[in-house]
């Protein structure tokens, strides 16, 4: 998974908001629907947010510090 600066910003955004939705990312990051949707799906794969729940926002499963630990683990695994 590619964790670029926009993805990092998206993860911080959903953790601060306490919920994750494509519309939140579209508004805050000024990205299109498709990109926002892919970001949410990638966050689910990384364990940052929970599964799709119909029209409700997804649950956020970690704090920012937990995310930093997970990111370091993912980056070390990629090396």
Where in this protein do the model-derived segments appear?
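C-terminal intrinsically disordered, low-complexity extensions immediately downstream
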Residues: 1-79
